[in-house]
Amino acid sequence: MINLAAVAGVRDSINNPGPYIQTNLVGFGNIIHLSRLHKVKHFVYASSSSVYGGNTKKIAEETDVVDKPVSLYGATKKSNELIAFNYSKLFSLPT
């Protein structure tokens, strides 16, 4: 399963959070849960550079801190990373 679905856009997520929460969080939760139930062999999730928040570096690195996104969009993408990590550990869903 490759999940590229999301409502994108940093600015709009601040003024209109509803669709971001519904699609990026609830929708993601539904997809990963169904992937587990249907015994999907591998789950791939496309996150976003928005999880790096206010990082001022020109090139982000995987070791950079990603716990302070500056938009709701970035927060939903980071939340999904954590959910995917937990599904991988709790239910042995390869991610």
Per-region residue spans from a language model:
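Catalytic helix-loop patch of NAD(P)-dependent Rossmann-fold dehydrogenases
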Residues: 15-33, 37, 41-42, 51-95
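SDR active-site strand-loop-helix element
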Residues: 1-5, 43-49
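NAD(P)H-binding glycine-rich loop region in Rossmannoid oxidoreductase-like domains
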Residues: 1-23
